Amino acid sequence: CNKFHFKGINGDFNEIIPKIEPKDLVIICTPVHLLLLAAQKSIDHGQTNILIEKPGSLYKKELNLFLKNITTQRIRIGYNRFCYPAFHKLLNICKKDEKILSCHFTFTEWIHTINFSNNLSDTYARWGISNSLHVISMAFGLIGLPKTISSYQSGMLDWHPSGSIFTGSGITENNIPFSYHANWKSSGRWGIEIMTTENSYRLIPLEKLRVCSKG
């Protein structure tokens, strides 16, 4: 805090937030199960521009209830990888110059790096929403949301009983075919590959854009 001239305040956000005067921006970065509670407390005490750490909530019902309480406030959920220059460069290319023909993406997780002490168990049991949605949302941000999709999963992990291997394919609302794969028991990484009329593009890692031209 001292390095960036911030004043640190320790304690329960239920007690601290009411004491904070309205700011230009409030960033909510708590364990997942507390995100909306802290955001609502901020709204109740006059904050109007709030950035909430992803995923906001693990449950659609909670997000919909929270949405009903928003009037004039500006509320965003922070999927920061949408701000990568590489993503916007590829998006611009595909909008202006080249038509997307198909897409493949991977969301294999480095589970050996996960800190299992930061959140409640349902955060890890819904890890696709908690974390993998970063790359999934980027892919669909490029090609559009699924119109039809076939999904398959197998295996399990102690903390993620619904599966450890995920595959699927479908067609988006823009009529672009896509496929995906993830294996949380093996090696790999996040990545997106876009095939256009002229080139194939890879966001692997997501921060960098690589191109493979025809011929």
Task: Set out the residue ranges of the language-model regions.
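N-terminal Rossmann-like dinucleotide-binding module
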Residues: C1-K7
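Beta-loop-alpha module in the N-terminal Rossmann-like domain of NAD(P)-dependent dehydrogenases
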Residues: G8-L51, P55-N69
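A contiguous active-site-proximal alpha/beta segment in oxidoreductase catalytic domains
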Residues: I17-I20, G56-F116
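Short, well-ordered coil/turn residues at beta-beta hairpins
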Residues: C29-T30, S186, T196
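Hydrophobic residues in well-ordered beta-strands that form the structural core
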Residues: L51-I52, I75-I77, L203
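Rossmann-like dinucleotide-binding domain that binds NAD(P)(H)
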Residues: N115-R189
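C-terminal glycine/acidic-rich active-site capping loop/insertion
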Residues: T197-G215
